[in-house]
């Protein structure tokens, strides 16, 4: 759409973006791990919201920062790299390109409204009787 991107705060805050296939691969490896453990999954390389919008190419609208919002969040992936030999394969920039390349596939995707969810749920439950 031609709507501007809404950026909370100044856009300099950084987040850890991870492409879905990298997350799926990490979950697969963790599910085959024979010990009980906790792993962080991410890129370990946070990117600013302004940089994301620059890659998306669009106008920006800034709104005030929310109270308590952290400036930087990212995953420490040291343990998952060491124990599962996992690391992300898709760079942030490549991931954004992949999403943009397939974005038109989502234009005709059905939207789930509360009414549609209620109807679908009712339909599902009739098969359980």
Predicted regions and their residues:
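Non-catalytic, hydrophobic alpha-helical segments
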Residues: 23, 27, 41, 52, ...
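Phosphate/oxyanion-binding loops and surfaces in catalytic or ligand/nucleic-acid-binding neighborhoods
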Residues: 1-5, 30-33, 55, 59, ...
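Amphipathic terminal alpha-helices
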Residues: 92-129
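Glycine-rich "substrate-gating" loop/helix at the edge of Rossmann-like oxidoreductase active sites
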Residues: 3, 9-20, 45, 67, ...
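C-terminal "lid/loop" region of Rossmann-like NAD(P)-dependent oxidoreductases
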Residues: 10, 38-39, 47-53, 58-78, ...
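Alpha-helical substrate-binding/gating segment
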Residues: 1-5, 17-39
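An acidic site on a long C-lobe helix of protein kinase domains
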Residues: 16-23, 48, 91-92
